[in-house]
Amino acid sequence: MTPVRMQHSLAGQTYAVPLIQPDLRREEAVQQMADALQYLQKVSGDIFSRISQQVEQSRSQVQAIGEKVSLAQAKIEKIKGSKKAIKVFSSAKYPAPERLQEYGSIFTGAQDPGLQRRPRHRIQSKHRPLDERALQEKLKDFPVCVSTKPEPEDDAEEGLGGLPSNISSVSSLLLFNTTENLYKKYVFLDPLAGAVTKTHVMLGAETEEKLFDAPLSISKREQLEQQVPENYFYVPDLGQVPEIDVPSYLPDLPGIANDLMYIADLGPGIAPSAPGTIPELPTFHTEVAEPLKVDLQDGVLTPPPPPPPPPPAPEVLASAPPLPPSTAAPVGQGARQDDSSSSASPSVQGAPREVVDPSGGRATLLESIRQAGGIGKAKLRSMKERKLEKKKQKEQEQVRATSQGGHLMSDLFNKLVMRRKGISGKGPGAGEGPGGAFARVSDSIPPLPPPQQPQAEEDEDDWES
């Protein structure tokens, strides 16, 4: 016969060893015991074989990791004594698959040996007769589960009880001409008198709802302290960095590369949003204004000869249209005005008294003409005085060039002066033409006011010469 196999296994459990039933015949009990022991031997063999396979797999993984460690250690020992800088390129992500392999049980795919077909055994002995006394004696030794849970008592109902099945509307639940639901609370109510008599004791106890106590700020008249709001804005702070005073080069240090130089400005700092300090701007010397006066005197002190009328006079008038109405004077007066503007020396009284901003050369020229009194007040100079003044100015230029020869800005200014002379068509040794003088006057700044002299004496000297 085939023994009855009882399943006492959990969900997901692969193996289930059969139990031997009590009160079996001798031959039947021996057969079931032999079958259970064989089944247990197969199960234990399968379990230990799977554990051995898992241990071998883990041992191979540990061996592969050990080989990687030994290889890395050999590389480290190779570069350990080197004094050259080595760049190490590392991946931005951890070297692992995006999705890890899920854990699998070692009993995955195992089959239950008990499902295999086993041989059938024929037993010749007969069943024993049922003995009720022996069955009662077994009840004393084995616990029997008896339900001893007390039945719940019916709670006292306040209303009429459950709803009847023949009620067709909600109004049938209410007392006549009232809003009292008798199935919920049973009361005696006279619709005409309005008096209510409660029958249940619990209905007589009325609970008064009281308000909660007032807060301490009202009851004790205490003023709450104003809480300072917390600031959750991010304020980066570099903190205090210790200053280390070490030499810039330390030779023959073990494990330190000597062919690598670090630059402080390689990238943004650790706190790029922190308010940085504004770098100090370089200061410039204001010595440029002094050679500028020399250039102005150069350009102003080269007037055209007085006898013929100067041809560039119409150019000046055309280049400065917003002149006052006094510009419509004869050509002779224009020549006199050119002479007066070109001879701006310390002996001239009508020179401009203020130096205008050098940003606009033509505007300053017109302003100086207006301050000098226009063309009508121009003064004529003799040829001898102009030649003497020209020699003095050349000597002053040479002295200043020698005294300021090492200054970068003065050298640059002298080069610009020479370039202007070359563009205007006059070299360093050639005489200056009237066109170049007026062009330079228009691009320059008027000089500072010289010491004033009596106008009458100046007029007499000019006319006598």
UniProtKB/Swiss-Prot annotation:
Residues 297-407, 422-465 are annotated as: Disordered. This is WAS protein family homolog 2. Residues 302-314 have a biased composition (Pro residues). PANTHER family: CXYORF1, WAS PROTEIN FAMILY HOMOLOG 2-RELATED. PROSITE patterns: WH2 (PS51082). GO terms for molecular function: actin binding; alpha-tubulin binding; gamma-tubulin binding. Residues 361-383 form the WH2 domain. It is found in: Early endosome membrane; Recycling endosome membrane; Late endosome; Cytoplasmic vesicle, Autophagosome. Component of the WASH core complex also described as WASH regulatory complex (SHRC) composed of WASH (WASHC1, WASH2P or WASH3P), WASHC2 (WASHC2A or WASHC2C), WASHC3, WASHC4 and WASHC5. The WASH core complex associates with the F-actin-capping protein dimer (formed by CAPZA1, CAPZA2 or CAPZA3 and CAPZB) in a transient or substoichiometric manner which was initially described as WASH complex. Interacts (via WHD1 region) with WASHC2C; the interaction is direct. Interacts with alpha-tubulin. Interacts with BECN1; WASHC1 and AMBRA1 can competitively interact with BECN1. Keywords: Actin-binding, Cytoplasm, Cytoplasmic vesicle, Cytoskeleton, Endosome, Isopeptide bond, Membrane, Protein transport, Transport, Ubl conjugation. Residues 1-54 are annotated as: Required for WASH complex assembly. The VCA (verprolin, cofilin, acidic) domain promotes actin polymerization by the Arp2/3 complex in vitro.
